[in-house]
């Protein structure tokens, strides 16, 4: 899409200073209306365009395999309506202590043996206390020493904590926006949108790659999906890693029973993310358990080039590794760096 106006993006500093993060400037690179226009393209036209953009920057027949391990499950103080790990919801997830280092390393070794090149560690905290950070940094150092790309998601960070993680060698920090600013208050009340932008700014300032995406299928409108993508695409730079999650409904959470998103709308979201953030790793994340193989293939056509791989994605199911390998083989898609 050719833009006649001057490009304006959102810097790390302005992420922290903007009082109304949804008030994108008139000359933003991707206005919400521009993104909505992409969503409205005929399906085949949208996928064709996304595949063209994808091929300009990536091998269209290669994906990265990522594994996500919950290193500290349950008991989170936040009230995110989708999350079974929230202490506010009765979803049957018990609070657990932080995993021991050797348990994490065993999981990382298994992930690498199964072909993963990226290992993500998630802890259900509102924000990590300083005493929690040292053991997590040990995990980062040891997992990185195995030759795996490292990512953690620990909740909100302070600037000095982001710097400590950088010094430990962390490659990526994940902190999702979840949805558009306008819809956000219907999903979460214990953390503001600006809180999220602040953490992303600290991560960026520390020199850590940003992993930031969202969740669709939470009852939001297409305009809200366009608003999420616009927020991401106007960051300067936009995130290196963009996970797109399809809501996994868990009994006991407020979003259980939400009308499911049309599968083709999910594919459209992947395609729009690819077009607006052409060099990002667009990750097909939560919700794959409910997707048939044809839908996953469409997601790859739309520009997804990473999947989360293994038995569990935090506390919800994920297709088994053997099934994933079989699907990739049928599609002649190679796993990055895997010779198995």
Curated annotation (Swiss-Prot):
Main function: Catalyzes the conversion of dethiobiotin (DTB) to biotin by the insertion of a sulfur atom into dethiobiotin via a radical-based mechanism.
Family affiliation: Belongs to the radical SAM superfamily. Biotin synthase family.
Catalytic reaction list: (4R,5S)-dethiobiotin + (sulfur carrier)-SH + 2 reduced [2Fe-2S]-[ferredoxin] + 2 S-adenosyl-L-methionine = (sulfur carrier)-H + biotin + 2 5'-deoxyadenosine + 2 L-methionine + 2 oxidized [2Fe-2S]-[ferredoxin]
Gene assigned in the entry: bioB
Record GO terms (molecular function): 2 iron, 2 sulfur cluster binding; 4 iron, 4 sulfur cluster binding; biotin synthase activity; iron ion binding
Note describing how the cofactor binds: Binds 1 [4Fe-4S] cluster. The cluster is coordinated with 3 cysteines and an exchangeable S-adenosyl-L-methionine. Binds 1 [2Fe-2S] cluster. The cluster is coordinated with 3 cysteines and 1 arginine.
Transport among keywords: no
Protein name: Biotin synthase
Statement: the UniProt record of this protein carries the keyword Transferase: yes
Subunit text: Homodimer.
UniProt keyword list: 2Fe-2S, 4Fe-4S, Biotin biosynthesis, Iron, Iron-sulfur, Metal-binding, S-adenosyl-L-methionine, Transferase
UniProt: [4Fe-4S] cluster binding residues: 76, 80, 83
Gene3D superfamilies to which the protein is assigned, alphabetical: Aldolase class I (3.20.20.70)
InterPro entries: Aldolase_TIM (IPR013785), BATS_dom (IPR010722), Biotin_synth/BioAB (IPR002684), Biotin_synthase (IPR024177), Elp3/MiaA/NifB-like_rSAM (IPR006638), rSAM (IPR007197)
This protein's pathway: Cofactor biosynthesis; biotin biosynthesis; biotin from 7,8-diaminononanoate: step 2/2
Cofactor(s) this protein requires: [4Fe-4S] cluster; [2Fe-2S] cluster
EC number: 2.8.1.6
Top EC class for this record: transferase
């Amino acid at each position: 899409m050719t833009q006649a106006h001057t490009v304006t993006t959102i810097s790390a500093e302005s992420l922290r200073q903007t009082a109304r993060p949804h008030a994108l400037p008139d000359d933003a690179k991707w206005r919400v209306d521009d993104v909505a226009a992409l969503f409205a393209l005929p399906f085949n036209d949208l996928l064709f365009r996304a595949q063209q953009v994808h091929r300009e920057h990536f091998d269209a027949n290669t994906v990265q395999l990522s594994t996500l391990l919950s290193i500290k499950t349950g008991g989170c103080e936040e009230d995110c309506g989708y999350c079974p790990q929230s202490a506010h919801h009765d979803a049957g997830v018990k609070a657990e202590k932080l995993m021991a280092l050797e348990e994490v390393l065993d999981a990382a070794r298994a992930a690498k043996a199964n072909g993963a090149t990226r290992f993500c560690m998630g802890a259900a905290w509102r924000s990590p206390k300083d005493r929690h950070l040292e053991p997590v940094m040990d995990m980062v150092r040891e997992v990185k020493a195995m030759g795996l790309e490292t990512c953690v998601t620990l909740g909100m960070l302070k600037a000095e904590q982001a710097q400590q993680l950088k010094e430990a060698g962390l490659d990526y920090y994940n902190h999702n926006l979840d949805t558009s600013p306008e819809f956000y208050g219907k999903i979460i009340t214990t953390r503001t949108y600006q809180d999220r932008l602040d953490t992303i700014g600290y991560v960026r300032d520390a020199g850590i790659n940003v992993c930031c995406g969202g969740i669709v299928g939470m009852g939001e409108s297409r305009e809200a999906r366009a608003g999420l993508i616009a927020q991401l695409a106007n960051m300067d730079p936009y995130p290196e890693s963009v996970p797109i999650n399809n809501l996994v409904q868990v009994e006991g959470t407020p979003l259980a029973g939400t009308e499911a998103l049309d599968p083709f709308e999910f594919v459209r979201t992947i395609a729009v993310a690819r077009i607006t953030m052409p060099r990002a790793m667009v990750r097909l994340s939560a919700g794959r358990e409910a997707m048939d193989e044809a839908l996953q293939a469409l997601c790859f056509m739309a520009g997804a080039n990473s999947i989360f791989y293994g038995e569990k994605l935090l506390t919800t199911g994920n297709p088994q590794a053997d099934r994933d390998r079989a699907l990739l083989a049928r599609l002649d898609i190679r796993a990055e760096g895997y010779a198995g």
